């Protein structure tokens, strides 16, 4: 309640309401806290929840994780487990450093509890992330996922080599890797969800560490089924469902102007479709392919419904923006019984 009544209004006023300014401020502050062990201990005592489960060979202290995009460069890593997250996914990171799309590129739709982003994989590059992870003073204590994307300067026909370069730089640090082939903000990226492209990509990456595929909610079920065939045939460890959507269904009237911004939509309007995709993946694969459910989780009930749809784990991004760490704790507590 303190977050929603006091902290969030102040964050939302930063930079004259610019969402990315608030995001950067939050990550900087958490990076500062991450260097203070006593502060981390206080946060852990308040927000930590034990609800362990093992998925794709990894033990998770609880099944509620931080989605990619919140801490792209891993600058605040020790803070996220202290806020209750049972795993953390950094990135999306690319082989080449890149600035992303021009600002403004992140927009809040508060009445809809949603966000539109067209960030464009802004990140410092795989090499910089590897150096930061190598310098961590102690183990994170939760599984670390690393989301990999294609560099904008890399042509589609060289995508496999681009992903491989990032993987090779980071394979010693990630507990699992997420292949992001579904962001709507990198031209041509979603073509990598096609059978031939995805088959070549997974053939190059699957092996040493668990590799998951992050899919778009805008794919028809027939295309998802084809993608799942490739994942099973190539030994992918799981699927992350879903990325942001290009659809604009379910927006509140006051958010129509913000919703007209180009980019991917996340948050409450995505919840139903994300659950549908999770359920489809779980049913289509007979539970053989673990699913990480992400999209529209803003309450503990939303998390429970995602688990009921077939998710083994869930991730938060937009829900964390609007509800803060109390949502992490409540969602993890609701998941104590798998």
From Swiss-Prot:
Main location, first listed in the record: membrane
Residues that coordinate or bind FMN: 68-72, 92, 147, 180, 214, 242, 267, 296, 317-318
Location of the protein in the cell: Cell membrane
Pathway: Pyrimidine metabolism; UMP biosynthesis via de novo pathway; orotate from (S)-dihydroorotate (quinone route): step 1/1
Catalytic reactions of this protein: (S)-dihydroorotate + a quinone = orotate + a quinol
InterPro entries: Aldolase_TIM, DHO_dehydrogenase, Dihydroorotate_DH_1_2, Dihydroorotate_DH_2, Dihydroorotate_DH_cat, Dihydroorotate_DH_CS
Amino-acid positions noted as binding substrate in the UniProt annotation, renumbered to this chain: 72, 117-121, 180, 185, 243-244
Cofactor: binding details: Binds 1 FMN per subunit.
Keywords: Cell membrane, Flavoprotein, FMN, Membrane, Oxidoreductase, Pyrimidine biosynthesis
Cofactor: FMN
GO terms, biological process: 'de novo' pyrimidine nucleobase biosynthetic process; 'de novo' UMP biosynthetic process
GO cellular component, one term: plasma membrane
UniProt-listed CDD domains: DHOD_2_like
Topology of the protein relative to the lipid bilayer: Peripheral membrane protein
MF terms (GO), sorted A to Z: dihydroorotate dehydrogenase (quinone) activity
EC number, as in UniProt: 1.3.5.2
Alphabetized Pfam families for the sequence: DHO_dh
Subunit structure: Monomer.
Family per similarity comment: Belongs to the dihydroorotate dehydrogenase family. Type 2 subfamily.
Name the UniProt record assigns to this protein: Dihydroorotate dehydrogenase (quinone)
Organism whose genome encodes this protein: Salinispora tropica (strain ATCC BAA-916 / DSM 44818 / JCM 13857 / NBRC 105044 / CNB-440)
